Amino acid sequence: MLYRVNRFTESPINPITGDKYDDSWAVFMLTDRGEKQVCGSFNGCAYSIKTNRSICAEWAFSLCDFIDFNSRLGKNIIVVATADELETARKIYRGHGCDERTLRSSEPAVLVHSTTPENWQRIKQCGALKSRNRLIAEGCIVEEKPIGALLGDPAEFSDYIMFGGGVTGEIVVSSRQHGFIDMDINAPYRPGARLYLDAAKIAADGFLLRDGTHLKVKNVLPLKPYLLFAATAESVGICGASTPAEFSKAADKAFDSIR
């Protein structure tokens, strides 16, 4: 069910039901302040994506991807936007979907996924990337809370393989190793592997999903024919410990040199 409101306060109380939120709710907010996009759970509110309409040129696609993706999950959705904005977004989005098989002009041609040294060995052995929940089901890892739970990520995030550019993936690896959300891009950590994958092929084969802010794949993604390059500390000339900033820069440089 979709609910549109003009005003919204992030709090533990759902303005639609008057009760506390449960996992069946998700919120998308158009704002005029802050960063381009911020996601997570704030002040006890449901998982939310806040999108700054003034600097996010793709806000209409982001909004409608969020609606499409979460509707398929059976979620109740709160959209904080004007009626005109919602109508405009739907007109722009007509003919599109969160699982469409063609890359959009705003989407990257290369997807990046970062992993720990231990997980990279497992990935090479099985020849595929697998979601956390798939690995738990196969007995490959012990069930424990993912690091994203500290940010308010919904439980179903563990059904997906997530991608992110820049230093984001290395921050996730570093945070896992440190046991807390460590946003310091210069903090020492042990790099694993930084994988570069062909986004157009992944989309064309029906794997790519869009949730309003992330690009991701559900359950399993074979390495072949999508993996373009795998960077490790050794392959980019880093000995021992590194930092998210150092490793991501060196890995990107190595990948760019073979393109």
Predicted regions and their residues:
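A glycine-rich, hydrophobic loop/mini-helix early in the fold
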Residues: 121-163, 167-169
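Short, extreme N-terminal leader segments that mark the start of a protein/domain
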Residues: 90-136
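Conserved NAD+-utilizing ADP-ribose enzyme module
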Residues: 1-106, 153-159, 167-259
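Hydrophobic side chains in beta-strands
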Residues: 114-116, 163-165, 197
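Residue-level marker of intrinsically disordered, low-complexity segments enriched
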Residues: 3, 11-14, 110-112, 121, ...
